[in-house]
């Protein structure tokens, strides 16, 4: 399918009083198919979301698969002081060259790769989980929290690219394609999942 700007725009605006606006979670599932768009394929603006992209071929002209950001609508609800659900993305059965950009600092994002090879930047301190059949190559500077059993063999970064990650131990490693992985334990940083 040739889409205009994006494949999915997901956002919320307040229609009145009530806490439901902060607890609602939208579900987005894209199974199979081919999609072309100019902007990020899936855009989440100040909204809690469960996103599954399974076996789809997505070509974004700007090179971004999922982007979260603060809603610029003046009626957008502000979750300040609330522990909101966040944005949970699963990429399954994919080989994709697109980035994941998390710019909504009012909620957290998780990314699970299941039988997926991802080439792209991951920004904003995304909590990243890779199953044994998945691999990530960063093609732009990235910031993540490594979750679960992630082996160095599953990670790569292009020459000149730095991946900053919260993980189990302090280490700096040169990856196979020449990029650098800098890992440090949680210490109250912007990427700390305990925050």
Where do the PLM segments sit?
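Internal alpha-helical scaffold/solenoid segments in large eukaryotic proteins
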Residues: 38-39, 49
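Low-complexity, polar/charged sequence tracts that form flexible coils or short amphipathic helices
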Residues: 21-22, 35, 43-45, 82-83, ...
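Beta-strand-rich solenoid/repeat architectures in extracellular/passenger domains
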Residues: 1-6, 12-14, 25-38, 54-66, ...
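Extracellular beta-strand/loop-rich repeat segments of large surface/secreted proteins
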Residues: 101-195
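All-beta strand scaffolds that present successive hydrophobic residues in beta-strands
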Residues: 9, 24-32, 48-55, 72-79, ...
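Ankyrin repeat (ANK) tandem arrays and their immediately adjacent linkers/low-complexity segments
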Residues: 65-71, 102
């Amino acid at each position: 399918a040739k889409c205009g700007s994006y494949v999915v725009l997901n956002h919320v605006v307040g229609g009145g009083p009530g806490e439901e606006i902060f607890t609602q979670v939208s579900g987005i599932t894209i199974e199979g198919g081919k999609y072309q768009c100019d902007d990020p394929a899936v855009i989440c603006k100040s909204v809690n979301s469960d996103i599954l992209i399974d076996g789809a071929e997505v070509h974004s002209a700007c090179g971004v698969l999922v982007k979260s950001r603060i809603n610029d609508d003046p009626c957008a609800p502000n979750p300040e002081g609330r522990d909101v659900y966040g944005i949970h993305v699963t990429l399954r059965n994919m080989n994709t060259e697109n980035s994941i950009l998390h710019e909504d600092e009012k909620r957290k994002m998780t990314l699970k790769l299941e039988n997926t090879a991802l080439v792209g930047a991951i920004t904003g301190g995304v909590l990243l989980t890779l199953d044994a059949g998945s691999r990530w190559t960063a093609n732009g500077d990235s910031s993540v929290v490594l979750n679960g059993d992630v082996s160095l063999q599953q990670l790569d970064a292009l020459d000149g690219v730095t991946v900053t990650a919260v993980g189990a131990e302090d280490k700096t490693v040169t990856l196979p394609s020449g990029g650098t992985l800098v890992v440090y334990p949680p210490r109250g940083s912007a990427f700390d999942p305990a925050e």
